[in-house]
């Protein structure tokens, strides 16, 4: 079973729309080692999707790190898309 842990400096829970808005040093860590770092994040609890329009760093392994602006994924970071990517992959 895939799981993720979200941490931030602050968050707003919108129970009506079933959303969580996280702000300030947001990190999402999946149990398989992926890590998303950004300044703001929206979690749609209805669809278990996360989104950000902010700049981000996404670490998929010890050697692969992607950077970009704009990100969407399922909550466990197994199906993700960086909207404006740039990156570094080490083939060692």
Where are the model-predicted features located?
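Mature-chain termini and adjacent capping regions
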Residues: 1-92
